[in-house]
């Protein structure tokens, strides 16, 4: 896990997920928040290649250490690796169960005031028309038919803020040339998270003169 900044006060945001999180977007998100004068620490908790099950196993081990960071917000996006066609293929019901366990553990996290961390849950981007192993045409179909509907259902059941990263890249497919976005795509992804976060941010911790 890496931090984009480490101010003594301000917001703490934990970005959790797979390689789409272990990427450029947390750094871009920090810049967007800093631009408006916020003291913010953005923690990159992305795990390259992780399915929901692998991330759950990681979280069971690393959860206590992450909890000690006392994040105000957790930004969660998982599911892309669950639609692989190799041994990482995850059945829909298993994916849903994994996500509920992950969210349940994150619900135990508290910020420095002792209040529960706010969790934002994102749909996963579409898979492009060019498939490369370990993804295939059936992977793209599962994103649409299974994974994202389950994410939407879980967000509603758990009363979480839902962030539409699927629709984001559906409208800008040129920024998603492969499974991973381009550099411009990661900036767009950070902006989408920022737009979802902004209404939830307190009117505090703004640097004097801003």
Regions found by a protein language model. Give the residues of each.
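Serine-esterase "nucleophile elbow" of acetyl-processing enzymes
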Residues: 1-53, 59-70, 188
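Alpha-helical cap/lid subdomain in secreted, periplasmic
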Residues: 32-35, 57-209
């Amino acid at each position: 896990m890496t931090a984009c900044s480490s101010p003594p006060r301000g917001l703490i945001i934990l970005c959790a997920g797979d390689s789409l999180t272990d990427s450029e977007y947390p750094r871009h998100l920090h810049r967007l928040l800093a631009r408006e004068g916020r003291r913010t620490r953005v923690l990159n908790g992305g795990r390259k290649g992780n399915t929901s099950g692998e991330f759950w196993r990681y979280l069971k081990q690393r959860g206590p250490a992450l909890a000690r960071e006392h994040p105000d917000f957790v930004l969660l996006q998982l599911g892309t690796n669950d639609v692989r066609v190799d041994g990482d293929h995850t059945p829909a019901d298993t994916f849903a169960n994994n996500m509920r366990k992950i969210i349940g553990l994150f619900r135990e996290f508290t910020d420095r005031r002792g209040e529960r961390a706010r969790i934002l849950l994102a749909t996963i981007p579409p898979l492009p028309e060019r498939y490369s192993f370990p993804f295939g045409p059936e992977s793209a179909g599962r994103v649409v038919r299974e994974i994202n509907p389950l994410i939407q259902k879980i967000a509603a059941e758990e009363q979480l803020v839902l962030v539409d990263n699927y629709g984001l890249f559906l409208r800008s497919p040129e920024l998603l040339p492969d499974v991973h976005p381009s550099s411009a795509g990661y900036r767009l992804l950070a902006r989408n998270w920022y737009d979802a976060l902004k209404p939830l941010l307190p009117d505090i911790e703004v640097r004097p003169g801003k």
